[in-house]
């Protein structure tokens, strides 16, 4: 078994072992569950077990699992995005509630384990929440898929002390804009889906 898959499996098993019976009912699903193929990035219930319903120790176990599937820069980006809801809450004067106790809530990220980690059959996991959607599917010795994956940022930039901006997706945003502005003629027409961006 590759070190990458072995580490991911060990960390998934440690997380599952930490769950109470009630947590298991939320976090564990069969690999064939249709919920495994659904993804979105809105600040809503993504299904599974939320950070709000876990202990601090379990938060660490989830983040350890997430880090097993990402580079250091990838994990740092996910961690930065997960903290943006505090900044967004401040920008909105702490008034958005979405008919729940706290509208912008950095604890509303959800983990789901599909199937049985370490078995010979397919298994996988998903982390979803505001502007984060990560999916991994595994069988035996290899990762079958790590898509769909989505990283977003709201706000895209925010001021820090000194002449600095906090931009979790800076290099990706800048590269995308550079690519787009390099296009012209029919290439530009093909690339431009709509002149009006989506609401979110």
Features from the language model and the residues they span:
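Short, mixed-charge, low-aromatic patches
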Residues: 16-21, 131-133
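N-terminal regions that are enriched for targeting/export leaders
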Residues: 18-30
